[in-house]
Regions:
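Long, well-ordered mid-to-C-terminal structural blocks that present hydrophobic/aromatic surfaces
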Residues: 294-298, 305-368
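Short beta-strand elements that form the blades of beta-propeller/WD-repeat-like
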Residues: 36-47, 84-94, 130-147, 195-204, ...
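Repeated scaffold domains used in trafficking and secretory/extracellular systems
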Residues: 73-84, 117-132, 178-190, 274-287, ...
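An edge-strand/N-cap motif at the start of beta-rich repeat modules
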Residues: 29-63
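Beta-propeller fold detector
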Residues: 63-75, 112-121, 163-180, 227-230, ...
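Beta-propeller blade signature
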Residues: 103-105, 151-163, 213-260, 312-334
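Bacterial Sec-dependent N-terminal signal peptides
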Residues: 1-41
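Post-signal peptide N-terminal segment of secreted/secretory-pathway proteins
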Residues: 52-173
Length: 368
């Protein structure tokens, strides 16, 4: 895949264990005999449950077809991750089960070939950091409170893109009280820029462990469930706060090292709500950097969906957000938000609907 040099732009639409296995496939890549890639665009698509990888010389005109321009994949792919000039990864989200996927390269005939197959712990978001493709979810740790409730922690998976090895964090990294407000959190998306890693931190309410350990962080007993309710990833039981008490704040964790063991710097703003898209337990990335290293943080204002419970529910009240979809910025070289703000629902040409997901679009220019 002899190309790159990204020209970046932003586009928005409304809307701990080791890896279980890693298998080295035959036909390892020999990058010295790769042809120049035909076309400046690589386009993953899914139709009817089948995944394809297409190539195109232009997105401005003409048509594109899987015939002579595409490769059908036997494996179902939920997300594609492009890593430098040599590899691209396809990973499959399997609801609450383990994730699966593969590492691919283009052979001398520009046909995708699989280098590695892998199975790994369930994930809720993903990205790249250094030599690794990373995924993360949250789950129970070995740490418990006086009542035996397990503390929630981050479960990181690292797939090394250079040699195919896999690993995970070897010590518990708590997701409890991560922001100092008693709530458990998760992460949504990863951005490498300015020699640092940025990730959006999503507050998720207080677990049983959190309520018992930091009772002073409970803003109102009305927010604590008195029985079972909700469904799926939103299911809760008595004694926990099932949704955040801080829906109108966004948080970005900034890491300067090479792993998540370090203490990050937390940038906070009250101009927008927490920054992510969400579908069930998947948290979609809504933070992106531009060519100059400025980080743009998008929020759909999801806190507004925390509607008040019915009168007979096992939960008396929730904190409902008020902020609309918006975008703010952390300038390159800074660890704090600046004054930039844009209301995405009232800007010129806006539909008035909230943002669901956003993507970072780029064009690719071939090397000379």
């Amino acid at each position: 895949m002899n190309k790159k040099n990204f020209m970046l732009g932003l586009g928005a639409f409304c809307m701990g264990g080791l890896f279980m296995g890693c298998q080295n496939e035959e036909n390892d890549p020999t990058f010295s005999n790769h042809n120049n890639f035909k076309g400046n665009y690589v386009i993953p698509v899914t139709a009817g449950g089948t995944s394809y990888l297409l190539t195109a010389e232009s997105l401005d005109e003409g048509k594109i077809s899987v015939i002579e321009n595409g490769k059908e994949f036997q494996d179902q792919i939920s997300y594609w991750i492009f890593y430098d000039q040599n590899y691209f990864f396809g990973i499959k989200y399997n609801d609450g089960s383990q994730g699966t996927g593969g590492c691919y390269y283009l052979d001398a005939n520009n046909v995708p070939q699989k280098k590695y197959s892998y199975t790994f712990n369930r994930f809720t978001t993903y990205g790249t950091w250094g030599d690794n493709v990373i995924t993360v979810s949250t789950g129970d740790t070995k740490q418990t409170d006086s009542k035996g409730n397990a503390a929630q922690g981050f479960l990181f998976n690292y797939l090394n893109a250079k040699n195919g090895t896999t690993s995970t964090n070897q010590q518990d990294i708590l997701a409890e009280n991560f922001l100092g407000n008693g709530e458990k959190v998760t992460m949504a998306g990863f951005v490498e820029a300015n020699g640092k890693l940025y990730t959006s931190i999503i507050p998720m309410g207080m677990s049983h462990y959190g309520v018992n350990t930091w009772p002073d962080k409970v803003l109102s007993q009305d927010y604590v469930a008195t029985g079972t309710g909700g469904s799926g990833s939103g299911k809760y039981t008595a004694g926990q706060i099932p949704s955040t008490q801080y829906p109108d704040n966004a948080y970005i964790a900034i890491y300067s090292g090479s792993n998540f063991d370090e203490e990050p710097v937390i940038a906070t703003t009250d101009k927008i709500g927490f920054a992510c898209g969400r579908m069930r337990s998947q948290y979609y990335q809504t933070i992106w950097s531009d060519d100059d290293g400025n980080l743009y943080v998008f929020s759909g204002g999801y806190g507004r969906t925390a509607t008040q419970p019915a009168a007979d529910a096992n939960l008396k009240a929730k904190v409902q957000g008020t902020l609309p979809s918006g975008v703010v910025r952390i300038p390159a070289g800074s660890t704090a938000f600046d004054e930039y703000y844009c209301n995405l629902e009232t800007m010129s040409g806006a539909s008035g609907h909230p943002l669901f997901r956003c993507w970072h679009f780029w064009a690719i220019s071939a090397r000379s």
